[in-house]
Amino acid sequence: MSKLTLSHPESDHKLILDEETGLIREIVFSSNSISRAANVTTSIKLQIDGSERRAPTGGLEYFGTTEIIESKSTSAPEQAVTNDGIEWRMRANIGGVSAEYRYGLNRKGPGCTASIIFFGNQNVLVRNFSLSMSVQLPKDSWNVQIPGNGLRNFVPVQNITSGVGVSPIGGLRGSSGLILATSDSHGCVAIWPDNFIEIPLVEFKGNGADNFTVAIDSNFGSDLNAIKSVELPIFSADLSVRNWDEFPEIFDGWLRAKSITSPNNPPAWINGSMIYEAQIGFSVFNEKFKYSPYPEVSDLIADLDRVKSMGFNCIQLMPRQPYPSYNIHDYWDIDTSYGPKEMMIDLVKQCHSRGIKIILDILLHGVLDKEIIKRAADGVRNGPYAHLVSADTADSFAADVNDWDNYLIAWSRHILDFEKYWYEGSPEISSLVAEHPDWFYRDSANNVQGVYTKAFDASNRDWQNYFIDACRFLMTELDIDGFRFDAPSYNDFPNWSVWSRGRAGASALGCLGLFERLRPVMKSIKSDSLLYTEPSGHAFRQSMDLNYNYDEQWLVTAICDPNARSPWGISNAKDLAGWFESRNLMLPRGSITAHHIDSHDTFWWPSWGKKWRREQFTMPQVKLLTLVFATLPGPFMMFSGGEIGIESLLPKISSTKQLFLNGEDGISWWTQDWIPDDVFVQSRTIEGKNIIVAANFSNKIQNINDLRMGKIASVLVEAGEHCQYSEGKLSLPALSGVILSVERN
């Protein structure tokens, strides 16, 4: 096997390629007396041609495709100078498809990058491109860090014996998508699937103590006859960092190099806020159970004083249930979408008079009509989950990020539960389809497609104008304080319309450009308005003031149910604190996360009788979860009804959150050896005192024998049994927690 070496004086990295295939064989770093190398076995798979059809659970699936795994280089690498550094371009033939591998050595950001160009004027439909890398590391004990995903800190690579999903940078349930292998003697090896044009599926697997595999399934698609060329970023890599402690600051530079930054100027009111998610109307489960906390808007108005008394200072109002629910009827029809317009105006006034902000849940993914509802429901009845719709479902967020079975069973049941309500309220065919045919996802036969709505293409500029106008209308008409943008990347499937088929997978993240345009419009109407969205991935933090905590939700089940723990997930409360610390270190600066344990999402998908955390776990555990998640940096959110059993705890938590706004030194996570494994501890310095949050998740007394902070000044909050305190020592009863103010020595 002949090798080619790509190196340049501007870089301390070099890449060694297989001359025959053009694929990477080795990544090398050399600087001063330090030299590191990782041998790489790279394989690819190109899926082409065939046909598409609606999948049983919506979107599209392919059939009759051809899979190609052979790559043959057809030219020597040609060097070019780019804005980012030095790049080599190497032509390749992939089973008859003309392409070009591009490898870069960068002046800023990660040391090296890899991408592929597909050339146009070929009678080829690219359906997907996948790459797998088996990385052989120097002999050592290697651990892996994948911050913001379903692993605890520093898991031995050899322990990860099956594939673990890694939510990518544009993903729903993760953060950066970064994979970092660390060792004491050989530094760090970073692999970063950094494409945020598509939403790839990424998987990590250990192959022993010093070898791992990263598989990247790009979700890329292109009609090569429709374009001249198209470039697919695959991954970046770096071997220069000595240890984990140095990495967060370096990674912040990588993010800035890719313009992945937070606006870092959120409305001042959001920092210590408590958000109450309110539902008007009723939702239906298993055809016979209904949940209706507020049948009408007037019922919510009548309850505002109680909501305020629990410490909530923001209402997040869901779309009216069961119709239109989380679907689009008509943005300008306030009566149908949320409630009677005059009553909505009164609700906003009543909230504002009490010092409560109010935001609306607003939808992007698609419009309802009878045609698509019937198609979705028939797909469920004839699909792979039809026989399971009555089966028990658990917390969907406890599973691996690439395991959707539990969710899809619950989703299938949800479609059938809501079918008649959606059907009755919808037009036969939405007029928007005829009026604006280019606003919608389509298959190659030009049929409008979707999951259970007719899917909007959020990358379409004219549709973006329509949505921005709708937001402007709702803000000015109702005087609301912002929006929570529900499921902006929900249409995560290819759009093969005439105008988008050059890059069929790009529509799923078309919302990113929309949000960039929308932000200044909203801020011009209300400078302290809130932009808040559901996905946790870094790409969604670029234009948002606030993001959901989908990346955290697996932690709730893992800390409360030992049977739900994986060999690589958190195993105790100290792991929980460590997970938060590493995740937060890797967020774009200024990012804010809204934390919850009960939301309408966590409520909707489990079976009846196991919907609330208080039904899944014990009340003492729920109190501890509230103590922990509500005192994390950022707002705390709760779905209406989640407060049952913790009504007296919530206002105390709210007061503490207001106190945290005066913090001096940020947050400290107590993960030292002298902290018991089953105790979660974090602290802040406020006005010369340390405010300590401690929670014992075990069934026995736990002692912290060295508070290192002096004597206790006051007890702010207790959850569970009374705790015992003396100078420098804290004794926590089983399943109990406390917030203490401690004098600093």
Which stretches of residues belong to each language-model region?
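Substrate-binding/active-site clefts of carbohydrate-active enzymes
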Residues: 263-269, 273, 279-295, 306, ...
